[in-house]
Amino acid sequence: MENFKHLPEPFRIRVIEPVKRTTREYREQAMLKSGMNPFLLDSEDIFIDLLTDSGTGAVTQDMQAAMLRGDEAYSGSRSYYALAKAVKDIFGYEYTIPTHQGRGAEQIYIPVLIAKREREKGLDRSKMVVFSNYFFDTTQGHSQINGATVRNVYIKEAFDTTAKHPFKGNFDLEKLEKGIQEAGAHNVPYIVCTITCNSAGGQPVSIANLKGMYEIARKYDIPVIMDSARFAENAYFVQQREEAYKDWTIEQITYESYRYADGLAMSAKKDAMVPMGGILAFKDKSMEEVYHECRTLCVVQEGFPTYGGLEGGAMERLAVGLHDGMRQEWLAYRIAQIEYLVAGLEKIGVPCQQPGGHAAFVDAGKLLPHIPADQFPAQALSCELYKVAGIRAVEIGSFLLGRDPKTGKQLPCPAELLRLTIPRATYTQTHMDFIIEAFQKVKENAENIKGLTFTYEPKVLRHFTARLKEVE
């Protein structure tokens, strides 16, 4: 299939879900009813849903078939051992705990690592700081409700949508080490490496950067947890962009990457392609105590440690999905779909972040320069996109970032982005063309789009349930 300008989707569509078309008037009323928050829209009112790629895509026939093997035993399920074997084979990690999704893993490991640091190193909870290349929203939320100050240490190119860099998800290693020294290593219970880096635009982290980060972590005896939702996409970018690994397989790159962490927390609803599921895993004997403490907490919060909130069939499906999500031709198609969408948007003058994995990220701050950050330009753009075309997207900016839990002040956000998240094996090139045409219509009316202000603001993870209105 070489030398073709464009290759179609590398799969056949066997089952379809009908969607309804709505009028502009209907969508305007739906948006008002939702409090100008697309999270609160009903899915039946969405024509193209780009809110997230988390559990919203198709599954493979092998994944669906695997569910028939499910062992629903309460403890010691053979389906658990199938999942644990997949984790060992792919990542090299000895200890596996299934969870219902990624935040289930976070609510377990975060308090355990904090308590361990306090017990062994004398951590002062009032001075506790945790670091990441950029925390995902729920990881940030769980860290904050456990009393930690979160610090994102990213490279200067990360949020410059005009800059080109092969690995915009990288840690700024100098800032990381300086931050640890300023906080005191004993007050840093963990470092989280997010791959790919969602908030920066699905941007990858190089293996060279992983090595440097892990060397710093080892120097100060700080455990590293890999936030692994998009581990396969990151491996694909390493293969395509990091010279030393151009001849490695996705499987080889993945295994190598996870040498530079002590544990992983995964929302398996992304690259593992399942509609529900998560994983918490630890590398070796050095993390055995943490593993056992997490198992105990799992019983209270998720379920018995050999099912962790998942039925046996779901664990079987996840074990297969971990492998299916790493297929070379699948990843090449998926990234090409993002690149096609970004190129089309930029061609009509819509500014975007450099193409990464899983989504196109529109620079709403540049598209709507008349709306200040505290009136959430990307959220306003999201509302307008829905009203124009029935497309639901998600804000990745000041609205999502939220307030400092100690001062109550809005946290400064490096960019105001609108994420157009592409569910796996769900939308075709025709859908991408429709999205581009919709943005052309939005752009024509951009100067008339109004900023937003709160009518209801939750204290934690406000972007999920907040309600807003237009600023008059």
UniProtKB/Swiss-Prot annotation:
Catalyzed reactions: L-tryptophan + H2O = indole + pyruvate + NH4(+)
Protein species of origin: Haemophilus influenzae (strain 86-028NP)
Cofactor(s) required, per the database record: pyridoxal 5'-phosphate
Subunit structure: Homotetramer.
Protein name, per record: Tryptophanase
Chain segments annotated as transmembrane: none
Residues found modified as N6-(pyridoxal phosphate)lysine: 270
Keywords attached to this entry: Lyase, Pyridoxal phosphate, Tryptophan catabolism
